[in-house]
């Protein structure tokens, strides 16, 4: 497992060879669990991250049978209307876009439910308005609490064009609860990702050209069929393994089925720009295998917008810089000094304690590569970025380094 690999690399290793998966992305995992719950039949959802456990418990409370074996969940679907009412308010706060799908699901039930949206109110309001046009009654009780369910929905033609993707999935699922046909208007042919989630589960979603745009229609009353899903890995969790493989001669690592999304790949691109041999194999649907070979990283200066895009990976970049040919300067990270502790100062002191050649200045650090790091004891202060960076130190340092087990768990709970 990924946890086990992270523990192993705390001791020096000569090379990293093999294939691995990293924990799946939270939102796609939760979406797959909800769609499995409202399907007819049994689904297996694999590579589910620990953080999706709250969603699993919520679905169980609504009467869905879910068994777990390692990171794979077996879900006994209850169909569109087979969920069980609960007496207590259902808390959707903090669930992000998955709250949208649950809101639709609950609105379509025969029973009345109370939901607490908390900080999700503003995000959900757009979908609440759209569901209202289908006839779903969603009444506001307080600023962030709503009552819904028990209403009869009817298909309609939406005037809105190019409804946001996550709203669109909510509306299309809502259309399954409605009587008649629901029609959406779109301007582009490639806005069909959410449609594929339903088509893959046996739902007929018609898309036809009309004038300069497209009409997407869904008939109510269709059955959603079970579908097994393997959740793609979270790119950020692959970086420690990639970094370790880059710096150890003889390594040959493949990270399987990683999701690479626009706007989230800046650190991957930076590594390749400074000489990292990382081949990206496109598997389709935004999923990729990453093939990693040992590489000599080159000098670079990271500043301004470039820094902003990789700010979450500064610690790992600094660790990898100790193995580079030349000097890597990381500027414009003074904001990291303002949190619960001086992140930059702590990173500098930690690397210096390992005999790394590192310098500190008010807005950043500079690291000179080519000098072996000595073993030491590291405190990641519960920060996920430091945990993963210091785990890589454990592989690269002469003699290994100590990092607490509880600290090691935190990247998988964020």
Regions found by a protein language model. Give the residues of each.
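Short, structured segments at the rim of ligand-binding sites
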Residues: 2-414
